[in-house]
């Protein structure tokens, strides 16, 4: 027995190495899987590929900037494009589905903020398991709704392509032609971007917590 900084250390001759995993490289699969998450270049670590600035001042990461841009700029523009498309064509199904998916995204953030505030006041975890699964199903449902709406409006016989083809027959100098084609292109892009963004939000909410559950091997709610 030796001492270092007043802490007793076990004699190395008394340590049974077989009790600690045997030969090198023979760790159980679940331990190797868990330890892989602590690598500096792990794909699942959000800061693994971040470039830290030389100064010590706190800065926003690129993920935060993209989130703020999507939350405050991109999604409102998508709603404006859907509204203009409805006003020009009178087709209500696809714009309504896109608007519902975007509004549902904002509602989930409001619910999460409210639950976070209430549960912190009560000294509880932010999200319970039923709330987590409910929000996961809700976000997944809004993503599917946005995808089906974008696909139906784009490829239906009287949908977006038909509207574009009809307005392309107008004279090139007609201002209605330019306006209609511009709104149609903006609406088509906004519908597919909204669908992709809805799937990204659903996957980001679910997979991060599912991954943590797999790593810790215990149910988590946050």
UniProtKB/Swiss-Prot annotation:
GO CC aspect terms: host cell Golgi membrane; host cell nuclear membrane; membrane; virion component
Topology relative to the membrane: Multi-pass membrane protein
Alphabetized Pfam families for the sequence: Herpes_UL20
Compartments reported by the entry: Virion; Host Golgi apparatus membrane; Host nucleus membrane
InterPro entries: Herpes_UL20 (IPR007629)
Segments passing through the bilayer: 64-84, 98-118, 131-151, 180-200
Family: Belongs to the alphaherpesvirinae UL20 family.
Function, in words: Plays an essential role in egress of virus particles from the nucleus, cytoplasmic envelopment and virus-induced cell fusion. Forms a functional protein complex with gK and this interaction is absolutely essential for their coordinate intracellular transport, gK glycosylation, expression on host cell surface, and function. Together, they modulate gB-mediated virus-induced cell fusion and virion egress and therefore actively participate in these processes.
Record note on quaternary structure: Interacts with gK (via N-terminus); this interaction plays a role in the coordinate transport of UL20 and gK to the trans-Golgi network (TGN), and is required for their cell surface expression. Interacts with gB.
Record's protein name: Protein UL20
Organism the protein comes from: Human herpesvirus 1 (strain 17) (HHV-1)
């Amino acid at each position: 027995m030796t001492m270092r900084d007043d802490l007793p250390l076990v004699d190395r001759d008394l340590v049974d190495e077989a009790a600690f995993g045997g030969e090198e490289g023979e760790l159980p699969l679940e331990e190797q899987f868990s330890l892989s998450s602590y690598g500096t270049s792990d794909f699942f670590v959000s800061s693994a590929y971040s470039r830290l600035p030389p100064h010590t001042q706190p800065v926003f990461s690129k993920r935060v900037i993209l989130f703020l841009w999507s939350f405050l700029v991109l999604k409102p523009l998508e709603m404006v494009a859907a509204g203009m498309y409805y006003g020009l064509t009178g087709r209500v199904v696809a714009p309504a589905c896109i608007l519902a998916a975007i509004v549902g995204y904002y509602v989930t953030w409001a619910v999460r903020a409210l639950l976070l505030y209430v549960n912190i006041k009560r000294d509880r975890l932010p999200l319970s398991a039923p709330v987590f699964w409910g929000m996961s199903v809700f976000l997944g449902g809004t993503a599917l709704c946005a995808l089906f709406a974008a696909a139906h409006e784009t490829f239906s016989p009287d949908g977006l392509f038909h509207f574009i083809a009809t307005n392309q027959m107008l004279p090139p100098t007609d201002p209605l032609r330019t306006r209609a084609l511009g709104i149609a292109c903006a609406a088509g892009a906004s519908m597919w971007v909204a669908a992709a963004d809805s799937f990204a939000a659903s996957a980001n909410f679910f997979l991060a917590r599912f991954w943590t559950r797999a790593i810790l091997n215990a149910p988590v709610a946050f």
